[in-house]
């Protein structure tokens, strides 16, 4: 159907959808060379504040806890907001990744999620994570598998990798990088709305701005 529409002059076609329909790599594969990708991220704090207004400090505290998923603004109370974020994480994001990517070790995927969520902005890499899982959990998962799983989390727009620009040569592959949550509210929901270290949360929020 889309190919038929492409033949009509002076027509722009916008194809939208959540990650439950298409992950990032699916979009690139389906429409390679025939489209432009426009990524719509959760609200930054600036966008969030433009919607809620009021005292900026109070708005920031609210944003640092619940994040910038737009539907959060329509939830009536704290319990509803927390339940929404928990459900979104478990029923949409995790299920999509497991089903579409054929994840064989969901337990390892969720361990990686917990580790990244609890240490946003900290330096790490797949080898370090693999060693941590081996020492703490007795897991024999390879660094390559960890790298692939992290790639799936990025592909689902749960995390974004920040690399150093002063690393060259072979060390580029082994040097630790930082991973930031695409939405701090989803990060908080994953770890039960605890570990509210404001320095790391603020760093994550600034990165997303």
Predicted ranges, named:
Residues 78-209:
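Accessory nucleic acid-recognition modules appended to NTPase machines
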Residues 18-20, 24-123:
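Interdomain motor-coupling "hinge/lid" segment immediately C-terminal to the ATP-binding subdomain
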Residues 5-28, 153:
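Sensor-1/coupling segment of RecA-like P-loop NTPase cores
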Residues 16, 40, 162-164:
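Conserved beta-strand termini and adjacent loop/short-helix elements that scaffold enzyme active sites
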């Amino acid at each position: 159907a889309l190919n038929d529409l492409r033949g009509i002059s002076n027509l722009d076609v916008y194809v939208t959808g959540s990650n439950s329909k298409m992950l990032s790599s699916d979009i690139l594969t389906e429409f390679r060379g025939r489209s432009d990708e426009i990524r719509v991220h959760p609200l930054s704090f600036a966008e969030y504040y433009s919607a809620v207004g009021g005292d900026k400090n109070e708005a920031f505290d609210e944003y640092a806890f619940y994040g910038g998923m737009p539907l959060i603004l329509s939830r009536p109370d704290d319990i509803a907001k927390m339940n929404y974020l928990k459900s979104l994480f478990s029923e949409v994001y995790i299920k999509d990744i497991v089903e579409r990517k054929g994840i064989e070790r969901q337990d390892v995927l969720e361990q990686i999620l917990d580790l990244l969520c609890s240490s946003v902005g900290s330096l790490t890499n797949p080898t370090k994570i693999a060693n941590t899982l081996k020492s703490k959990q007795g897991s024999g998962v390879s660094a390559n598998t960890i790298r692939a799983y992290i790639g799936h989390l990025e592909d689902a727009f749960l995390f974004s990798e920040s690399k150093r620009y002063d690393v060259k040569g072979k060390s580029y592959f082994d040097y630790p990088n930082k991973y930031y949550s695409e939405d701090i509210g989803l990060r908080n929901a994953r770890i039960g709305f605890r570990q509210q270290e404001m320095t790391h949360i603020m760093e994550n929020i600034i990165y997303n701005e």
